[in-house]
A protein has these predicted regions:
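Alpha-helical phosphate/pyrophosphate-handling elements in metalloenzyme active cores
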Residues: 1-21, 28-36
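Short hydrophobic/aromatic-enriched beta-strand-loop microsegments
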Residues: 17, 48-49
Length: 454
């Protein structure tokens, strides 16, 4: 419990959350009751402890879809009541994984798989990279120990040469930024093992063929300084076309903001530079934990201000929960939404609003991301002013206009073969379920009418 509290303190959580981390096992492992805990530490702490206890008692039987789906329902409901419940649980899971060497091999794999499928993606969606990154690496360590230790050995083998190269870049960049009058902190880091492994899988390459094993990070005071620093960097090194990403203008769904650019160094070796403000760095490290403010709301707490808007994905999952009776379907939707390997594409509405969709999405996905009524009445789409087929794959920066008609009979089942987002699939399936129900009601009434007339 003390280690969990220390992790929460490192995230700079409020005193009630840290207390809940310290006490999260008390009700389950001692004779102390929840009522006694409330009298001793207050309603807020006991509410958090109770929420964490209920999550701890969940049994993630990988062979039983209904149990997994029900557990996910309970977890997301707990998050909706108070996001700090899941933050305490993430800290608890991180501590468990850190001490996982004492588990039997079967339990190591079971817990690692559960962590990789559920807890690490949730930490990612909450933007808490400090926890997410370590959970990923520890999961890889227990699931594929031979891969993990091979990576550790090979990365360590080149450590001295790599550190010397990174330091030369850091010194060179810092000198040019100083000369341009931009105050900045510049540092370098090796990418994490799971990140490297994922890149190897995605690109079907060996470690020797992965060139950007490290990144240089520049931190400045203002957004204006971010773009000024980018200008300096692009004058110093040759940028690789197609490898620039502006997450400041178009933040990720988990609040992450930075400029990413991949460059060719003076030795011909490519490397990545990330540029962000100090506030953006804090958000990248701590995510929702860096911003969460609370106001009294009955027995729990709710997010204040704009931070509540950052959890739109959670509200989406709760909507699926209400709309979906099928456990297998719900489980598939949630895991698809939390998919660690999914990349995003950023596009625009006709009014200039940014929409973030999974890579590979089509205009149908875009239509349903606006509203189910738009998707259900869609008859075509224009991308950048030109008509496109419905299976067109949206590219970054596309401006999309959906053409609708009140005469549309609704979506086609063939759309399910085309759409890429979980949200669109769910809304299309929901439309057909509603239609079937209405058709059955009409058939039933007709049958009764015929029977009465006979």
């Amino acid at each position: 419990p003390l280690c969990v509290a220390i992790i929460l303190a490192d995230l700079e959580m409020d005193k009630e959350t840290i207390a809940a981390g310290l006490l999260h096992d008390v009700v389950e492992d001692t004779v102390m009751t929840l009522d006694e805990l409330t009298k001793e530490f207050g309603l807020e702490v006991s509410f958090l402890v109770d929420g964490v206890t209920k999550l701890t008692q969940l049994n993630w039987d990988k062979d039983k879809v209904e149990i997994q789906a029900e557990n996910l329902r309970k977890m997301f409901l707990a998050m909706a009541k108070d996001i700090r419940v899941i933050i305490v649980k993430l800290a608890d899971r991180l501590h468990n994984m850190r001490t996982g060497q004492y588990w039997k091999p079967e339990k190591q794999k079971e817990k690692a798989r559960e962590t990789m499928e559920i807890y690490a993606p949730i930490a990612d969606r909450l933007g808490i990279s400090k926890i997410k990154i370590e959970l990923d690496d520890l999961s890889l360590k227990f699931l594929k120990p031979e891969v993990y230790y091979d990576l550790v050995e090979k990365v360590d083998l080149r450590k001295d040469a790599r550190e010397a190269f990174v330091q030369s870049i850091v010194d060179e960049v810092k000198a040019h930024l100083d000369e341009a009058g931009i105050e900045a902190t510049v540092g370098g880091r090796v990418k994490h093992f799971f990140s490297i492994y994922k890149k190897m899988l995605k690109q079907n390459k060996t470690l020797d063929q992965i060139y950007d094993l490290f990144a240089v990070r520049i931190m400045v005071d203002t957004v204006k300084d971010c773009y000024a620093a980018l200008g300096v960097i692009h004058e110093m090194y040759k940028p690789i076309p197609g490898r620039f990403k502006d997450y400041i203008a178009m933040p990720k769904q988990n609040m992450y903001q930075s400029l990413h650019t991949t460059l060719i160094g003076s030795t011909g070796q490519p490397f990545e530079i990330q540029i962000r403000t100090y506030e953006m760095h804090r958000t990248a490290e701590y995510g929702i934990a860096a911003h969460w403010k609370y106001k009294e709301s009955g027995s729990g707490q709710v997010a204040a201000g704009k931070e509540e808007e950052k959890l739109s994905w959670l509200r989406q999952i709760l909507e699926w929960q209400r709309d979906t009776d099928d456990s297998k379907e719900f489980l598939s939707m949630v895991k698809g939404d939390l998919d660690l390997f999914s990349d995003s594409v950023y596009c625009f509405t006709p009014s200039g609003d940014v929409k973030t969709l999974p890579s590979g999405s089509t205009p149908i996905d875009f239509a349903y991301s606006i509203h189910s009524a738009v998707g259900n009445k869609m008859v075509g789409a224009r991308v950048n002013g030109k008509l496109v087929p419905i299976e067109y794959q949206i590219q970054n920066g596309d401006r999309i206009e959906i053409i609708t008609s009140q005469n549309s009979k609704g979506p086609s089942r063939d759309w399910l073969k085309v759409v890429h987002s979980t949200q669109a699939k769910n809304k299309i399936n929901q439309w057909f379920k509603t239609q079937m129900k209405e058709d059955n009601i009409i058939r039933g009434r007709d049958a009764i009418d015929r029977y009465c007339k006979a």
